[in-house]
Amino acid sequence: MADQALVDQVSAKIDALAAEMIDALSEVVRIPSVNPKYPGQVYDEVVGGEGEVSKAFARHYEGIGAEVDLFAIEPGRENAVGVIKGAGGGRSLIYNGHVDVVPVGDPANWTGGDPFSGKIDGDRVWGRGATDMKSGIMAQTFAARALKECGIALKGDLILEAVAGEEVMDHECGVTATVKRGYTADAAIVSEPSSPPSPLAVVPVSPGLLWFSVTASGKATHSSMRGNSIRAGGDGAAVGVNAIDKGILIFNAMRQLEEEWGLTKKHPLFRPGHFSIHPGVIQGGPHGVMVPFFLSEFLTIDYCVWYSPDDDPEAVKREIETHIHRAAQTDAWLREHPPVVEWKLHWPANTPDADEITAVTVAAHEQAAVGSRFAGAPDIVGFAAVEDATFLTLGGVPAISYGPGDLRVAHADDEYVMIDEVVTACKTFAVAAMDWCGVV
């Protein structure tokens, strides 16, 4: 654990800097930094916001005295890295977060007005990116600043990172680009919002994500022929087959498998039932004529699969494909016209060898949160979603997560972050750096 006198000193400094930190957070929230590759975005109209936010963080890094590297794999999508060199003899640590955000949806649904207002309203800051995750990056940045202003020198290097690309797994443009550029360390803490189930939990693992589609085909004919195609004594498939009926068989099979997972897929750091097979998009109809006057020629369902970090993703794929195949065998048409499965994306689970940095973060939170509503030992949980910690771990840097904010308001209308979470997270980051890197 960090020396208590130093903890008290740096905590007092962060309290003194808190108003400035929240103002700085508001400023970066006001910069729209929607990921230009997010579905539905026109790239050339959106690109550039990520870079502007990274440049803002780079200015903060320069003010701390860090060695700053501002670079882009794609123009307008800069990553900012600030290296605070240690005196030697300590362990190195990366503090990482992503600057890109998801689209705001319909601005009319935001009750506070401008989704990028960055409004400071009593106990919270409003706006897209407040929780996910500009608050976390700012807390890490001001933790480093507080250490410097307290005259606390670390033995190990502290590397601050604000990266692009996370929201669409564009890690080659963001976090992986930093690793390939040589920015590695003995451990990393990604400041993703680590609630739910409780604020400021410590997150040593995350699930994996698979995106796939399954398409059932049909045979178009006039909708008045439905009875002839499905009733006993009719012409059956010879006249037509409604793909929607066939696709629903697959939908029901996936729902059955998901219910089985609720009983069989367990992990000690995840709530029961977390691992799921979510039908997120359904498209179907007659090709080219989206009216209900035909028997539909296709039904495609896109699924988002959340699987346990203990599971082999290839085994998960085989299980899903086997279940679809078995369902198809119950139907004469599907036996002859099997559903087509397409695997579209895989975001691997994060399973780092990170017991030490996890323990350091837990202890740092306990020291930093004294006297706050977050006092005591933090929960240790699995991350609900996926994150860049995966790609740091895959790049040889064991990475966990801890940060202010709540995933239940991330990607939602009226996103916000609680100010006291940002302040306590900032203190935790400062204490963790002292403990992990060592103090001269």
Pin down the residues of each PLM region.
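Metal-dependent amide/peptide-bond hydrolase catalytic core
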Residues: 1-9, 13-16, 69, 74, ...
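Acidic/His- and Gly-rich active-site-bordering loop/insert found
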Residues: 2-128, 149-154
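Residue-level signal for inorganic ion chemistry
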Residues: 28, 32, 192, 247, ...
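Catalytic metal-binding/acid-base residues of hydrolase active sites
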Residues: 34, 100, 109, 167, ...
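Fold-level recognition of mixed alpha/beta catalytic cores in primary-metabolism enzymes, strongest
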Residues: 130-131, 135-258, 295, 411-427
